[in-house]
Amino acid sequence: MRLIIAEKHSVGQAIAQAVGGHMEKHDGYVQVGDDLVTWAQGHLVDLAAPDEYKNHDWGKWSLDTLPIDPTPDWQWKVGRDKGADRQYKVVAGLMRRGDVDMLVDACDPDREGEAIFRRIVTHVGVSKPMRRLWVASLEEDAIRDALASMKDETEYQGLADSAMIRAKADWLIGMNASRAYSLVYNARFTVGRVQTPTLAMIVDRDRQIAGHVSRPYWKVVAPMGGWKLSGERLDKREDAEMLLRIVNSDDFAFSIFKAERKQQHDAPPRLYDLTGLQKDMSRLHGLTAARTLAALQSLYERKLATYPRTCLLYTSDAADDTPCV
């Protein structure tokens, strides 16, 4: 019997519908024929906080305990979101069932999706054959095609390793640097691998804007029988006036040294990735990045858009069968 683990309830339901057959609903999972389908709640399992390491005195905020580094004995914990502990027990119980002989990773098709599945497997401590269901659309045909072409989970080990490295780097920098700055400056600070450099870039840009001193410049624009020839910016007014006198002199003539005509093909614009869409929604409609992602996630779960958290600008061959809108 296969146990298919999706990242969230709505995706699990879509997969169960695509599998087809008689469906029995249970608390935290559904059974469809000989398949079990369950789901996480995002990051159901995460790295433990320093104060949760009982064999270390890391609960006390002190410079004497820094740096904190659990390597190689990293510990995991179930997330604190509402219902996380209950759903974890459901998933863990299903994974340990004797009639479950295969685990299917159906979490989101990206690095974090891979991390969510691997962390659950690690924390539960089971060792069973694992396959990867890689699908970016919740259309039933797309899910069925993905089920028929699953690969061994070991082929995604590099993706899993990158997720683990990212998580541990964030933990080490965040836990150590946040405590260090807070203790040194006697105030609560949060320092992050991504957050802090990003804030620094924003502050630097804000300072550049605040310290900007506008400087005048001059340009000479000459009308040319229906179009205009514009010169470069000039820092000195006298230079612009001298150029203007030359252009207006009776013996001055414009000459065309080279004219070229060629046929050019402009390809249609590429599809959006998440960042590009968030930029345009902010610029055109004033939407925050979070609101844009929430709207796109809702469209994805309604089978009206492909997986939103991607940097890819292309679709699969399945898009050829998508009806035109």
Regions found by a protein language model. Name each.
Residues P129, L199, A305:
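Conserved ATP-binding/catalytic motifs of P-loop helicase motor domains
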Residues M1-A167, W171:
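Intrinsically disordered, low-complexity regulatory segments
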Residues T310-L312:
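Short, Lys/Arg-rich nucleic-acid/phosphate-binding segment
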Residues D34-L36, L44-K82, G93, F189-E301:
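Long, highly charged, low-complexity internal segments
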Residues Y314-A319:
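Conserved small/polar residues in nucleotide/adenosyl-binding loops
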Residues R302-P308:
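A short, conserved structural fragment
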Residues I143-Y217:
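C-terminal or mid-to-C-terminal helical accessory/interaction module adjacent to the motor/catalytic core
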